[in-house]
Swiss-Prot record:
Function: Has strong anti-HIV activity against T-tropic strains of HIV-1 and weaker activity against M-tropic strains of HIV-1. Inhibits HIV-1 fusion and infection of CD4 LTR beta-gal cells in vitro. Inhibits fusion of HIV infected CEM-SS cells with uninfected CEM-SS cells, and fusion of HIV-1 Env expressing HL2/3 cells with CD4 LTR beta-gal cells. Binds to HIV gp120, HIV gp160 and to a lesser extent HIV gp41. Binding to HIV gp120 is glycosylation dependent.
Keyword Disulfide bond belongs to the record: yes
Biological processes per GO annotation: regulation of defense response to virus
GO molecular function: polysaccharide binding
Keyword Ubl conjugation: no
InterPro entries in the cross-refs: SVN-like_dom (IPR049004)
Annotated region (SD2), positions in chain: 51-89
Disulfide topology: C7-C55, C20-C32, C26-C38, C68-C80, C74-C86
Organism, scientific name: Scytonema varium
Annotated keywords: Antiviral protein, Disulfide bond, Lectin
Sequence segments annotated as region (SD1): 3-41
Name of the protein this chain belongs to: Scytovirin
Length: 95
């Protein structure tokens, strides 16, 4: 990863969950081991304050992927639309 607040969903990595080819494919301060697995300390479960660095996995929302009841269920600076979908720009690289 790129530091304790770096947000990356390792489950979606091209080589499979927690598999990596570089540090950017590992969450938080984790690094990619020589055997191709993410290792070390991931980000804190708390997504932090809402804004461009806010990290939230919309795929796990109760109403379904990208569905929301409030903006805290949307990644980065995205907001929840009146129709219940996350909209706008996510704040981190997506897998």
């Amino acid at each position: 990863g790129s530091g304790p607040t770096y947000c990356w969903n390792e489950a979606n990595n091209p080589g499979g969950p927690n598999r990596c080819s570089n540090n950017k494919q590992c969450d938080g301060a984790r690094t990619c081991s020589s055997s191709g697995f993410c290792q070390g300390t991931s980000r804190k479960p708390d997504p932090g304050p809402k804004g461009p660095t806010y990290c939230w996995d919309e795929a796990k929302n109760p109403g379904g992927p990208n569905r929301c009841s409030n903006s805290k269920q949307c990644d980065g600076a995205r907001t929840c639309s009146s129709s219940g979908f996350c909209q706008g720009t996510a704040g981190h690289a997506a897998a």
